Amino acid sequence: MPIPLAVDQLLSDKRLRKASRRRWREMKGRARLAEQRRVNKLRFGDYSRIVRMLADCCTADLKLPRTGAKVVVPPTFSIIDDPVTALQVILSFAKLARENRLRTVEIDHSRMQVCDLAANAVLDLVASELSTEARQRGSKIRFFGRYPIPTHLKRFVQCIGIVKQLSIAHEVPSPEEKNGVRVFDKRKRHYHDPVDPTQADFKSRVAVDFVDHINGCLNDHGRALTPAAVHKLCVYIGEILGNAEDHAGFEDWTIQGYLDNAVNTPMCEIAIFNFGASIAETLTGLPADSYTWRQISSYVLMHRGAKLFRAGWRERDLLTLIALQGNVSSKNRSEKDTRGQGTVDLIEFFQKVYEECAKDSGEAAKMAILSGSTHILFDGKYRLSGSPERGKVIAFNAENTLYKQPDSSYVKSLGTLKFPGTIISIRFPLSTTSTVALGVNRNEPNRD
């Protein structure tokens, strides 16, 4: 039976209205995207502020070779294992780019044998910023390079390294090559629009997604975060990212995670870094009568009075170390304030990871914090201890007191070398022989 003319016209009008509304939504979406790009372009400016920050920290005199810019990644490229060499490579690249109009850049990884996620992430970000800068000018930089020889490192460069960061389509690994690899990569760019205030803020959503990534890595090897540990990790990753926004004076941070299950001893790697003021610079800028400065000044005065400060142990190194202790934050105004626990909680998380890994792996878990020109290494030898009431302390000396100088093998001054911000780099091995959940032992009651 044919549809009556009136009904047919009604359905036709309804389809037209739906199509019209769809076109209107699409037009509004394109307009919003165009406006967002315009605003982001204005905020970014003509030159990358991050590349400028890094370039300003480089004291070496550099000349651009006639053959063009070339970055030679060293055999050990790691914030954990060799921060000096890693920083020199990164800062030199930034300065070369800032002082010259680069048309081609070669990044040679062929010598790289040992690396960590953090060093590569910062180097890749410089390349990414230069690529964005070139697009702003309507030009282009051609990037090319050489892969590392070890297969797992080539996979690393493809899955989370320069290939991914620059979206080099013809070098993207196949699904078979990516099988067994877990990647997490989020960045808050300083030139992007603020998120919709009606939605959960970006850093909170990133913290939740990151904890899901870590849990996935652990699940691959018969481990798991307990519900209590999931909650804790979300909270203090959120606080660490919050610190990056609140203290540095420049809202640009990155958090990455990587796991390659195809290697003999899979290593779970974490990199968190931000740009802006270092930890020591933030504390140095506090008023003398502020609560936090009164809280920490006794340590500074004691080291000054005992003439402990010297070339390898400076006031800024002490301030960086003090900031790792419980309840120390430039944002605290009284004893009732509880900011400053994020890094302490991260150290405790690392200690639990270290204990788990030490049971069944020949590889040791390690963590490093690099802020400004101070590098602090964690490998399980020195531990955070003390009561929640009096505050937890890790002083990196036998007495575990901040009134004495720390072990220079663990708390190092990098001299004139400086990173404009803070980097946290963590790596720990995973295996299938342990099923104890991280965070709360299965044989212990949940105290949360």
Identify the meaning behind each predicted range.
Residues 2-69, 283-448:
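Flexible, glycine-/charge-rich segments associated with ATP-binding catalytic modules
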Residues 114, 118, 215-238:
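Conserved short strand/loop->alpha-helix "switch" segment adjacent to the catalytic nucleotide/phosphoryl-transfer site
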Residues 71-166:
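Amphipathic alpha-helical interaction surfaces in cytosolic regulatory modules
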Residues 159-206:
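Internal, well-ordered alpha/beta segment that forms a basic, Gly-enriched binding/recognition surface
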Residues 195-224:
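ATP-dependent phospho-/nucleotidyl transfer catalytic cores
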Residues 126, 160, 227-263, 341-353:
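Conserved ATP-binding N-box helix of the HATPase_c
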Residues 243-291, 360-363, 408-413:
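ATP-lid-like helix-loop hinge signature
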Residues 77-82, 110-118, 278-279, 329-332, ...:
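Short acidic, S/G/P-rich loop/turn micro-motifs used as interaction or catalytic elements
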